[in-house]
Design a protein with these regions (language model features):
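Short glycine-rich anion-binding loops that position phosphate/pyrophosphate groups of nucleotides
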Residues: 69-72, 93-95, 143
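The conserved Walker
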Residues: 1
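NTP-dependent small-molecule kinase module
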Residues: 11, 15, 125-163
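A glycine- and Lys/Arg-enriched "phosphate-lid" helix/loop adjacent to the NTP-binding pocket
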Residues: 84-128
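Post-Walker A helix-loop "phosphate-sensing" segment adjacent to the P-loop in P-loop NTPases
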Residues: 14-23
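Walker A/P-loop
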Residues: 6
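ATP-dependent small-molecule kinase phosphotransfer cores
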Residues: 22-71, 76-82, 109
């Protein structure tokens, strides 16, 4: 949630010369705006669409996949990601997320039009057990996008992970 996953993912994919997949964009292309799906069909249906998009990306050519912040809350998504992908958590503190959300023009369905630190912390706390099981965690609080991209690329190289 507002950790910069899409921006980082695009830049990392470009640096590595691989394809980039944005799961939210894939869902929007197939089913319409995220907020419309949440309001008309509910979060559970959105998570199913998200899972389908994740599977489609995993079945395509290798690359970088940017997930929505809540993707790993859906058990099937987490299961397939654990089995078929390397998972990187870009860890940004809730206060920084709040600042980013306040500057954003996108309304996040689980946060609402007026983001609050308490709501962000509530979601963050609920999701943290799933985030913390990532293969790699980037403590990104004081890092630029370029630094985060470089750190992930270095980790991939060190682990001899080829995409």
């Amino acid at each position: 949630m507002a950790a910069g996953k899409s921006t980082i993912g695009k830049k990392l994919a470009r640096k590595l010369g691989v394809k980039f997949y944005d799961v939210d964009d894939m869902v929007v292309t197939e089913h319409g705006p995220v907020s419309d799906i949440f309001y008309a069909q509910g979060e559970q249906q959105f998570r199913k669409y998200e899972y389908e998009a994740i599977c489609k990306a995993l079945d395509s050519e290798p690359g970088i996949i940017a997930l929505g912040g809540g993707a790993v809350t859906y058990d099937e998504s987490l299961k397939v990601l654990k089995k078929r992908a390397y998972r990187v958590f870009v860890k940004v503190p809730p206060e920084q997320i709040l600042g980013r959300l306040r500057r954003s023009h996108t309304v996040r369905p689980l946060i609402g039009a007026t983001p609050s630190l308490s709501k962000i912390k509530e979601l963050y706390t609920a999701r943290m057990p799933r985030y913390s099981h990532s293969d790699y965690v980037v403590e990104a609080q004081d890092m630029s996008t370029a630094q985060v991209v470089d750190q992930i690329a270095q980790w991939l190289h060190k682990k001899n992970i080829k995409l």
